[in-house]
């Protein structure tokens, strides 16, 4: 089984985590922000896949090791490229920046393990070639000594970290997949299935209705996800288990007051989790109305 995971921020303090396969939404989970505890709560309700594609959301790798330890992770190569682009910009002004930008961009066209090996070699050689340039230092406004080309170093490290974690080219290795599974001609290297499908449509809906309250935005997320599940109930049946604006508002207020809570909707399989101090203590449970 191949799965995709992603998170959508409904507001600055509310995020909905979504997990889907090639056709349907399999689960979603509402949290204040992406963290390993929230990811675990979502993943525990879903059968472990052979491979999961992620954009690198905070806490996901930690949750993956705990809940789906045998699943292979494919880091979305497009997001890996975008992370480099944020540091270099789309028009780098230095030779080192231009070269690193092109190396990152070439991630999007790698089709086999040979090309992947050549790409890794290019990344290593880039660091060697520009070693002197990258080692230049400067002092900031406080007089602290720091790398002059710190943004380039961060960009390179973001790629090198993914290489060490062995999560960039999982899509090129079919040895761990069940022969009965069918994903077409190629395994996915990006999260486009969920980013360009489920999430893109949901983001568009939320963007077109910016004036909606947080309670309504949460309900929109729930409705949208639910209607993309394999066998959704009728609208009248959904209304019987749909959380009300009042119940969402009450719970969201408790979150903002830094209450430690974890609620759930058994019928929907969704919940809200608020966990800031990263302790293992149990917390009180608040159910929806």
Identify the role of each PLM range.
Residues 54, 61, 102-289:
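Acidic/histidine-rich catalytic cores and adjacent linkers
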Residues 9, 58, 82, 198-199:
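Short hydrophobic/aromatic residue motifs in ordered secondary structure
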Residues 55-104:
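Conserved beta-strand -> loop -> alpha-helix junction used to position metal-binding or nucleic-acid-contacting
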Residues 14, 63, 87, 203-204:
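Short, function-defining helix-loop hinge/capping sites that tune catalysis or transport
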Residues 1-70:
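RNase H-like nuclease fold core
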